[in-house]
Amino acid sequence: MKEFRVRFAPSPTGPIHIGNMRTALFNYLFSRSEGATFVLRIEDTDLERSSKGFEELIFKELKWLGIEWDEGPDKPGPYGPYRQSERLEIYHRFAQKLIEEKKAYRCYCTPEELEEDRKKAIERGEIPRYSGRCRYLTKEQEETFIREGRKPVIRFMVPDDEVIEFEDMIKGKITIKSDTLGGDMVIIKSDGMPTYNFAVVIDDALMKITHVIRGEDHIYNTPKQILIYKALGFEIPKFAHVPLILGPDRTKLSKRHGHTYIGQYRELGYLPEAMFNFLSLLSWYPEDNVELMSKEEIIRKFNFKRIHKSNPVFDIEKLNWMNQQYIQKSPVERIVDLAIPHLKKAGYIDEIDELRYNWLKDVISLYKDGLSYVAQIVDMAKTFFVEEVDYTGEMIEFLKSPNSIKVLEAFKGYLKDKSEITEDDVREWMKKAQKELGVKGKEFFMPIRIAVTGEEHGPELVKVLALLGKNRVVKRLDRVLNLIE
């Protein structure tokens, strides 16, 4: 049985987009569910925009999500090198082969000439395509152009009136006519760098890739690549073009929809297992329709035949719900460790000793189950880290009521002789005080909560008071009583 091989081939020109990460994930899931080899290839031929920093970021984000590769720049295999910038001689060798077989040629057209041809085609009501003017240059014509200082590109001869068909694993049979492909295509640019469509064919063929799984925005590239496969006598892989992810307004996911890079979600405190789970369900669903699944369960259930043709919508509310489920199941220590950088960035904490860490654990435990992502702790638990809390005009008016003043003064009096606040003690006092003051329920608890936290809602009040400590609670009571006098 033939060994299946798939690849993820990002360009290190920026952070990984959500759509690209979903493509990487589907390649990974296919490889692990089918026992295939997963190759990571870096397409860094855009020398100006590519950087080692972005390459390292690609490695980091993939590893964070839990995607491991079998071969790649850092995991040498039999078909390397795995960076396109290290494979230039290979591309030139195959380009020369095509020239010798009269399937490609050097083109000396200037940008001005090409632009003029494009304008004329539009004026005639035609789709712009390369005219083919350099297809059959004589040796003398080439020498003249060289003397003029023209640097040639190498163009692949696209056959006229050929019908290119392929069976897409998701979309079914796709048919495209060769005369819609824009004419003879550039395969080597004037600076010697290969174009995407040429390099990707050479790499996929030599790396023995059997299944090319990528976004549907590459469908138009596929017939061009099939022509190159055929011209070089390479075996054509199977293609699967996964539907593009849409925003809530059903347009292509972009920055205007919010965060679009995987790293932005990592930095906000989304858990990798939640993101792995969420992304896997964009276009795919298991037979049992279960939504919350571990990585191992997803791999076990994954079947490429269950990928839908329709475009999935990136539903941030669904992601938040799913991440919340994973946060709830996580040990509090894990959430504390993820929260500390956010609290430091907000200026709420500095160095942390064991005592402070344990206090943080207790504070974060109050909010943990309500977090959609870890960075929310900065706003949710703000009252524990600021000296003074703010009050709205409505809050001040509420606190000015006779019952509110009565409750606050009684609470302050109770604290006067206490060295510290304990949950059991304050709970007992509250029971007695409600009877003695004749103020019960919301009328009793709300003044204390607002005065001490600046919030109308929150975790169990006695726990909040105990964690804030007597000194801060008394300071806030004094301040609010001064404000409302």
UniProtKB/Swiss-Prot annotation:
Primary location recorded for the protein, binned into one broad class: cytoplasm
PROSITE patterns named in the record: AA_TRNA_LIGASE_I
EC numbers: 6.1.1.17
Entry-linked InterPro entries: aa-tRNA-synth_I_cd-bd (IPR045462), aa-tRNA-synth_I_codon-bd_sub2 (IPR020751), aa-tRNA-synth_I_CS (IPR001412), aa_tRNA-synth_I_cd-bd_sf (IPR008925), Glu-tRNA-ligase_bac/mito (IPR004527), Glu-tRNA-synth_I_codon-bd_sub1 (IPR020752), Glu/Gln-tRNA-synth (IPR000924), Glu/Gln-tRNA-synth_Ib_cat-dom (IPR020058)
Superkingdom in the source lineage: Bacteria
Renumbered ranges of motif 'HIGH' region: 10-20
Gene Ontology MF terms: ATP binding; glutamate-tRNA ligase activity; tRNA binding; zinc ion binding
Catalytic activity: tRNA(Glu) + L-glutamate + ATP = L-glutamyl-tRNA(Glu) + AMP + diphosphate
Entry keyword set: Aminoacyl-tRNA synthetase, ATP-binding, Cytoplasm, Ligase, Nucleotide-binding, Protein biosynthesis
Subcellular location as annotated: Cytoplasm
Alphabetical list of Pfam families matching this protein: Anticodon_2, tRNA-synt_1c
Residues where ATP binds: 255
Record motif 'KMSKS' region, residues: 252-256
GO CC, any one term: cytosol
Keyword Transport: no
Keyword Protease: no
GO BP of this protein: glutamyl-tRNA aminoacylation
HAMAP family noted in UniProt: Glu_tRNA_synth_type1
Subunit record text: Monomer.
Stated family: Belongs to the class-I aminoacyl-tRNA synthetase family. Glutamate--tRNA ligase type 1 subfamily.
Function (record text): Catalyzes the attachment of glutamate to tRNA(Glu) in a two-step reaction: glutamate is first activated by ATP to form Glu-AMP and then transferred to the acceptor end of tRNA(Glu).
PANTHER family the UniProt entry points to: GLUTAMATE--TRNA LIGASE, GLUTAMATE--TRNA LIGASE, MITOCHONDRIAL-RELATED
Descriptive protein name: Glutamate--tRNA ligase 2
Organism of this sequence: Caldanaerobacter subterraneus subsp. tengcongensis (strain DSM 15242 / JCM 11007 / NBRC 100824 / MB4) (Thermoanaerobacter tengcongensis)
Gene name of the record: gltX2
